[in-house]
Amino acid sequence: MKNTMKIAFAGILIALMFVLSWTVLGMIPLGVASATTVFIPVCVGIIFFDDFKYAVVFGLFFGIVSLVRSFVPQGFLDPYFQNPIVSVLPRLLVGIVGYLIYKGLTRLMKNRIIVSSLAGGFIALINTIFTMGILILVYFQDVNQTFADNGFSILTALKTISLLNMLPEIAIGAILTPIIIKVLDKISNKNLN
């Protein structure tokens, strides 16, 4: 794929992140927090481009989208994401670590569909782990009090977030990512299976 086409397609994926973040398809309010599908363009970008620089860019823009979106909160944890350490840093790490996971998977197996599915699931998983981990590291006392004010213990809240956010996000990432990659491979004649 020519460089101009790569940049244009990267721009489309980044624009898609912004569009998803402002629709119910991308940010699904669940009361405690918002489940997201905004990571799907990140998964697709990491796998389709197979380029560390692009993975960093996709992770960075995922974080910027989260930061911008936090100023119109839907869940009671969303205002904490107005801090770039909580919104941008974990998503930047998702781009970096997601790329490393993808590259590791490509060394273990050659089937691009299976690799895409596993990478999509793992990227969703690390998104939740990094985001919740950094949120709790930075704002433990505040988050603990926020949960208590809303009738939750922090442990119960984390279990709830894991069930309501993480598991569906993993499933969505594992299902949608390979479907999109397969279509893009056919379109770009980049079928590597």
Question: Where are the model-predicted features located?
Answer:
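Hydrophobic transmembrane alpha-helices
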Residues: 1-57
